C-alpha cells in the first residue's frame, strides 16, 4: 500500500475503554455460564478479533481462535463467515463443542456444530424463538425472517404458535421490522 501523504495522515485513537465497556455489555446479556464448553471462533481478521474471545472466555468457555490477526488489508480474506472451512477444520481437529464465524464488521455470524457442520440460520431462529416463548420473553410472540427462509421454518413456527413477520432480504429491512415489532432478534 502506498503511504499516506503527510497532510493526509489521520489520528490513531485507543478505543480500549469503549471496547471494554462493550465487552462488559455483551457479557451482561448472557443468561448462563459457558463453563466446560470448548468453542471455536473465526474473527475474519475484523472487528471481533479482540472482542469475541474475551466475551467467551469471561463466560467460562475455553476458546480457540482463527482469523484474529488483522493487518488492515486482510479482513474477510479466506476466513470468516464467507469461508467457514477454517472454522470447520478447527472445530473437528480440536474436538470442540461448536464454533462461530463472523464477518468483518460482525453483522453476520455463521454457526457450526460439534462435527463442523453449518447450523443454518432458520434452525437457529426456530430454537431461539421457541426458547424465548417458553421463557415468556418472546416479544409480540413474533420472530422476523426473510423471504429466503425455508418453508420448514414457517411450518415449525406455526406448530409452536409463533408468528413470523416476513421481510425482504437485508439487514436494514430486518432491523426495521425488528424495531417496529419490538422483537429481540431477526434473521436477514
Language-model features, listed with the residues they occupy:
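Short acidic, glycine/serine/threonine-rich loops at helix termini
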Residues: 50-54, 76-79, 109-115, 123, ...
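Gly/Ser/Thr-rich loops at beta-strand to alpha-helix junctions
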Residues: 44-50, 106-107, 149-151
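Self-splicing inteins and homing endonuclease
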Residues: 98-99, 104-115, 179
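Buried hydrophobic positions in well-ordered alpha/beta secondary-structure cores of metabolic enzymes
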Residues: 26, 42, 84-88, 100, ...
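Glycine-rich phosphate-binding loop signature in dinucleotide/nucleotide-binding domains
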Residues: 91-96, 137-138
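Proline/glycine-rich low-complexity loops and linkers
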Residues: 2-23, 28, 115-175, 179
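Single conserved hydrophobic/aromatic residue that forms the stacking wall/gate
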Residues: 176-188
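Gly/Ser/Thr-enriched, mixed-charge loops and adjacent short helices
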Residues: 1-92
Amino acid at each position: 500500500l502506498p503511504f499516506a501523504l503527510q497532510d493526509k495522515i489521520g489520528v490513531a485513537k485507543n478505543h480500549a475503554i469503549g471496547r471494554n465497556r462493550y465487552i462488559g455489555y455483551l457479557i451482561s446479556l448472557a443468561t448462563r455460564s459457558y463453563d466446560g464448553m470448548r468453542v471455536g471462533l473465526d474473527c475474519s481478521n475484523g472487528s471481533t478479533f479482540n472482542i469475541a474471545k474475551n466475551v467467551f472466555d469471561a463466560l467460562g468457555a475455553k476458546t480457540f481462535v482463527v482469523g484474529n490477526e488483522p493487518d488492515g488489508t486482510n479482513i474477510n480474506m479466506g476466513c470468516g463467515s464467507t469461508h467457514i472451512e477454517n472454522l470447520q477444520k478447527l472445530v473437528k481437529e480440536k474436538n470442540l463443542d461448536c464454533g462461530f464465524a463472523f464477518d468483518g464488521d460482525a453483522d453476520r455470524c455463521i454457526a457450526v456444530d460439534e462435527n463442523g457442520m453449518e447450523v443454518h440460520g432458520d434452525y437457529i431462529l426456530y430454537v431461539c424463538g421457541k426458547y424465548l416463548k417458553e421463557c415468556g420473553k418472546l416479544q409480540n410472540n413474533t420472530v422476523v425472517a426473510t423471504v429466503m427462509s425455508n418453508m420448514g421454518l414457517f411450518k415449525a413456527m406455526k406448530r409452536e404458535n409463533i408468528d413470523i413477520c416476513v421481510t425482504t432480504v437485508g439487514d436494514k429491512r430486518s432491523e426495521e421490522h425488528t424495531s417496529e415489532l419490538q422483537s429481540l432478534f431477526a434473521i436477514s
